[in-house]
């Protein structure tokens, strides 16, 4: 296979880390500014310092990508984002990473010349969502870390999109963009750049009978990924950018990791896959810089497994600590204290009766940049003329500049004398002009002034008109809902059947439910599609495509864009509803889906009542009861404990406060869903909920058994308080 150019993409959580990455050989860096980035606690530069960072990177031909990879509320998007990005755009920012669909649409409108990269926070798992993003103007997709080499190759072959994947650093246990763990437990949302990493804490695995299966272990803490050995395979799968994680790490870490990946990328680009081999010394150096119980190769070659988890994480020995300190000292001296230099070619010309002339040129990022400056007219020497060595001595002084001489030619005529100050001034002026030219070639003209957004009036549902939607994940819950419809005719508007639970019997079940609905209030039947929709899931659905096409359901509830594309490609003309994790944090993202014919959209779970009131309208669905899905994971707790039976069941994770989080394993697609220890309960706030203006309210049944669903449905009717443990979620507090 033809070798393509590869990009070594480095993290920079500070200006110092940026310099370290550049010195160590990064092709590009990604960093956050003072707002809207997924690492709010890094030492992110702001204002003029951020602009200096862009210029610094460009001086060396290194690209800088700015992270705006969080979900934005309406006020932030409409009143802050344009002014935040405008100076960066003018300074030649190379790209912006985004998570929010509304942000994507706004940037494409305001800054059409600014490339947009889709963040891994978008949970991009297949070619459908990549094509969708390409239609919206995205130039690069950062794929979910969980994808295999086969899946990556499939995406590249079908889309041709520029792809970026993680090759080194920390792995989240949850699919990026789908985690609410930190948000719900402490109000620090990963979707807002403030994750507190509860996944790194210890938990006990508890079975369905509440028997502890383990002591306290870090069951949700993956080892860091090190895919150094897989660079040829990753490149040949179609990946262009090799991303290193670590914006919270020190500059020496950045330098050390970038240096090694630079070495092996260059080796591969020069020699190909044949003979590609990683030296053990380099592998050990990476381990020394940082590891959690060793490394794994991530998900490139396996779906999940115990060997990917950091269950032990033993403390470093004294010898390892000394070796680490020595390595950090060495890296600091070589890459942090010592900045990279740009090789310069120069020609100095001094002849009688003409101004001195200095021409400087350098090649950066494959382009030649050249400047020419003039100085004073040389004097005729009265006594001893200046020798060539004296001119060279002054012109070669480059201390305090980012340049080093590659070549300097002198053209001298006659017997000349030039004051040292004049030579120094000429040299200084020339180097400043070259530096300015190198930086300003990236600068852009001012964008067009931001035009006021056309006001879109969305009709709100009147209090008391809210429809009841209910989702079920077990047959027992389904029966309880059916019993409710018989006794409370006309109360239910829509029933969602979880696809994986009922997949084998949908063909028979849906017609039965439609008949039941016609007898008890004409409610609708929707199929709730899987939380993730990857290549193996898609193939299974394609094998049953005729069944999905002919299924007499009223529509589908999608939990990711991949499912939307699958349904549309299959010719589906039925209703499509958005679940809460296809985020519509702002009106722009909501309108984007509406224009695609997706009217009913579930409100995000991280907005408070005031914010919900601003975005809710007659086609909004407000969740009023249910356990929040805290994590959707490719990892499986059963497999981690070597207890995989390929049989769905419910376990629990018990934390240090003895709270128990239900864990469901979905075996058809091999993923886990971890739920909150307490359900959201807003049934006694019915009057307040109705003032939001949403057209429907949804009750999510997940772990409820026996009479619980039936009793809870009655509480929706009566609006009565509940004596059990519950949470108000973010209804009052929201997220920062």
Question: Which residue stretches match the model-derived regions?
Answer:
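A cross-family signal for key residues in well-ordered alpha-helices
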Residues: 105
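Conserved non-cysteine loop/helix-boundary elements of the Radical SAM core domain that shape
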Residues: 43-44
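Surface-exposed amphipathic alpha-helical tracts and adjacent flexible/coil segments at the periphery
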Residues: 1-24, 28-39, 54, 60-68, ...
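Conserved phosphate-binding/catalytic loop of the ribokinase/pfkB sugar-kinase fold
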Residues: 122-126
């Amino acid at each position: 296979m033809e070798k393509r150019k590869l990009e070594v993409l480095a993290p920079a959580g500070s200006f110092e880390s940026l310099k370290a990455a550049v010195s160590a050989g990064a092709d590009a860096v990604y960093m956050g500014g003072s707002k809207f980035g997924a690492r709010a606690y890094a030492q992110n530069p702001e204002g003029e310092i951020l602009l200096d960072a862009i210029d610094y990177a460009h001086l060396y031909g290194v690209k800088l990508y700015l992270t705006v990879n969080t979900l934005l509320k309406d006020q932030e998007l409409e009143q802050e984002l344009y002014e935040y990005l405008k100076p960066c755009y003018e300074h030649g920012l190379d790209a912006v990473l985004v998570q929010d669909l509304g942000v994507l649409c706004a940037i494409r409108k305001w800054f059409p010349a600014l490339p947009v990269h889709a963040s891994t926070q978008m949970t991009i798992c297949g070619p459908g969502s990549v094509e969708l993003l390409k239609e919206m103007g995205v130039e690069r997709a950062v794929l979910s870390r969980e994808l295999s080499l086969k899946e990556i190759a499939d995406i590249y072959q079908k889309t041709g999109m520029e792809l970026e994947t993680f090759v080194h650093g920390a792995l989240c246990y949850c699919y990026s963009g789908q985690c609410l763990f930190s948000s719900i437990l402490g109000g620090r949302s990963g979707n807002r750049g403030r994750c507190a990493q509860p996944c790194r804490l210890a938990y006990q695995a508890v079975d369905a009978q509440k028997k502890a299966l383990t002591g306290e272990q870090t069951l949700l803490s993956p080892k860091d990924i090190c895919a150094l050995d897989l660079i040829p395979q990753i490149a040949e799968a179609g990946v262009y950018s090799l991303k290193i994680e670590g914006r919270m790490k020190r500059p020496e870490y950045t330098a050390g990791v970038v240096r090694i990946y630079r070495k092996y990328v260059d080796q591969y680009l020069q020699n190909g896959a044949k003979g590609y081999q990683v030296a053990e010394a380099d592998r050990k150096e990476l381990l020394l810089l940082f590891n959690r119980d060793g490394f794994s190769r991530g998900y490139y070659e396996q779906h999940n497994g115990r060997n990917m988890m950091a269950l032990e994480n033993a403390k470093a020995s004294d010898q390892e600590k000394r070796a680490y300190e020595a390595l950090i000292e060495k890296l600091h001296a070589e890459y942090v204290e010592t900045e990279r230099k740009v090789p310069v070619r120069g020609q100095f010309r001094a002849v009688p009766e003409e101004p001195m002339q200095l021409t400087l040129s350098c090649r950066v990022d494959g382009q030649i940049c050249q400047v020419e400056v003039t100085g004073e007219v040389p004097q005729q020497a009265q006594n001893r003329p200046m020798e060539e060595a004296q001119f060279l001595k002054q012109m070669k002084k480059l201390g305090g500049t980012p340049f080093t001489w590659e070549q300097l030619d002198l053209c001298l005529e006659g017997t000349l004398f030039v004051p040292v100050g004049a030579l120094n001034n000429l040299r200084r002026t020339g180097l400043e002009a070259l530096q300015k030219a190198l930086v300003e070639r990236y600068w852009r003209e001012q964008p067009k002034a931001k035009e006021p957004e056309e006001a879109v009036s969305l009709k709100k549902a009147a209090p008391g008109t809210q429809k009841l939607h209910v989702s079920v994940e077990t047959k027992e819950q389904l029966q309880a809902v059916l019993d409710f419809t018989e006794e409370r005719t006309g109360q239910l508007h829509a029933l969602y059947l979880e696809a994986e639970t009922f997949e084998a019997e949908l063909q028979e079940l849906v017609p039965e439910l439609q008949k039941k609905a016609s007898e008890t209030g004409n409610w609708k039947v929707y199929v709730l599609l899987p939380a993730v929709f990857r290549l193996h899931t898609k193939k299974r659905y394609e094998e049953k495509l005729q069944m999905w096409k002919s299924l007499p359901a009223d529509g589908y509830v999608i939990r990711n864009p991949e499912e939307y594309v699958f349904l549309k490609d299959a010719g589906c003309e039925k209703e499509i509803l958005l679940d809460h994790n296809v985020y519509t944090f702002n009106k722009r993202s909501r309108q984007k889906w509406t224009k695609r014919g997706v009217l009913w959209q579930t409100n995000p779970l991280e907005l408070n009542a005031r914010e919900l009131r601003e975005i809710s309208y007659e086609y909004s669905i407000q969740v009023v009861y249910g356990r929040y899905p805290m994590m959707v994971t490719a990892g499986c707790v059963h497999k981690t404990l070597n207890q995989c039976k390929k049989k769905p069941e419910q376990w629990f994770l018990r934390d240090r406060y003895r709270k128990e989080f239900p864990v469901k394993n979905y075996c058809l697609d091999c993923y886990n869903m971890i739920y909150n220890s307490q359900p959201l309960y807003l049934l006694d706030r019915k009057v307040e909920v109705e003032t939001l203006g949403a057209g429907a309210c949804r009750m999510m049944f997940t772990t409820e058994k026996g009479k619980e669903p039936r009793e809870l449905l009655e509480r929706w009717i009566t609006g009565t308080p509940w004596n059990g443990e519950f949470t108000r979620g973010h209804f009052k507090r929201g997220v920062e």
